[in-house]
Amino acid sequence: MDLTKRFNKNLNRIEISLIRQFDQAISEIPGVLRLTLGEPDFTTPEHVKEAAKAAIDANQSHYTGMSGLLALRQAASQFVADKYNLHYRAEDEILVTIGATEALSATLTAILEPGDVVLLPAPAGYEPIIKLVGASVVEIDTRAHQFILTPEALEESLQEQGNRVKAVILNYPANPTGVTYSKEQMQALAGVLKKYQVF
């Protein structure tokens, strides 16, 4: 029995991302430092290994609440408060995920509907998540400005796409370019986004 015709039709819109294709192509080359997928260039630190072992020895290996371990969410809340002066309630405003892709997948699944548009400064690698939920990607070409999204380009894309835009993904440091934004650049983008009802 072939059940493939019963799969989500949006799966046909998804291709393996270019960064994954590139990573697969170079992964067999000896001595290559693979920074393609945001992998660190170091192994797990000893204190992290020891903490994981201690947690297992203490039988802390069962399911947590669906938002993640409260102590971890409290630590995350304190971290962003100290570092960025952003204040979130650990109890109901922070969700622990295993990485950025899971976090984006959960978020985009919650906010997007078929017909919605997500603006994505290119190059980037999150198109499959967006397409899976039936939304569309509109890439913003950033090559002219060393892969930095400018407020002018963002404003132009928001106006061109109109009310269809549901979200803008700002991923930095960005794979595959390594670009990062200054505080001033982010404030300029925030100034544009404040005028629109987008995530």
Q: How should these model regions be labeled?
A:
Residues 1-10:
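Generic N-terminal amphipathic, Lys/Arg-enriched alpha-helix
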Residues 12-99, 106:
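N-terminal small-domain helix-loop-helix segment of the aminotransferase-like
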Residues 27, 131, 194:
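Anion (oxyanion) recognition and catalysis
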Residues 100-104, 123-126:
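Conserved coil-to-alpha-helix start sites within the AMP-binding
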Residues 110-129:
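Conserved PLP-anchoring active-site segment centered on the Schiff-base-forming lysine
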Residues 121-122, 139-144:
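Short beta->alpha connector loops at strand-helix junctions that form conserved
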Residues 132-137:
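A short helix-loop-beta submotif of the ANL/AMP-binding
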Residues 142-199:
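Active-site phosphate-binding strand-loop segment of PLP-dependent enzymes
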